[in-house]
Regions:
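Short, well-ordered coil/turn segments that N-cap beta-strands
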Residues: 25-28, 62-67
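A general structural detector for well-ordered alpha-helical segments in enzyme core domains, enriched
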Residues: 15-19, 23, 51-58, 82-90
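Solvent-exposed loop/turn segments at secondary-structure junctions
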Residues: 4, 74-75
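Short acidic/histidine-rich active-site segments
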Residues: 68-72
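Acidic/histidine-rich catalytic cores of soluble enzymes
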Residues: 1-49
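C-terminal helical cap(s) of enzyme catalytic domains, especially alpha/beta-barrels
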Residues: 77-103
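A structural motif corresponding to the C-terminal end of an alpha-helix
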Residues: 55-64, 93-100
Length: 103
C-alpha cells in the first residue's frame, strides 16, 4: 500500500521506493490509495501526499503489473461519480508509466 508506506516513510525516514526495493522478488501486486500525515482512510485521490508516478515507476521496475485502488464510500449520494473520478485519477497515473513506446 503506497499510501501507508508514504506515512511510514515520515515516521522511519526510509523512502517509499527504498521500502519497495526491499521487497524485490516478493511483490506481485500493489494497493494504491491516498493518505496524508497520520491519516490513512477516506482521503480523496489527489488531495494527499502519495507519490503515485514515482512509486508506480518503481513498482514497474520491480515487475509489478497488478494494481488495485482503494475507494471509500462516505455517504455521498453521488458515489458513482466518486468512483469514476477515482478510477480516472488512477488511470492517469498508471497509463503514462505503462504506455508502449511506438516508433
Amino acid at each position: 500500500d503506497i499510501g501507508n508506506l508514504k506515512n511510514a516513510s515520515l515516521l522511519y525516514g526510509k523512502s517509499v521506493n527504498e521500502d519497495l526495493q526491499s521487497g524485490q522478488g516478493h511483490l506481485f501486486a500493489a494497493h494504491l490509495k491516498e493518505t496524508i500525515p497520520d491519516h490513512y482512510r477516506e482521503i480523496p485521490f489527489g488531495t494527499g501526499h502519495t507519490e503515485y508516478t514515482e512509486n508506480i515507476e518503481k513498482l514497474k521496475e520491480l515487475g509489478v503489473r497488478m494494481f488495485v485502488g482503494e475507494f471509500w464510500y462516505t455517504g455521498n449520494k453521488e458515489w458513482k461519480n466518486d468512483v469514476k473520478d477515482a478510477a480516472l485519477f488512477l488511470r492517469n497515473k498508471l497509463d503514462p508509466v505503462f504506455e508502449e513506446v511506438t516508433a
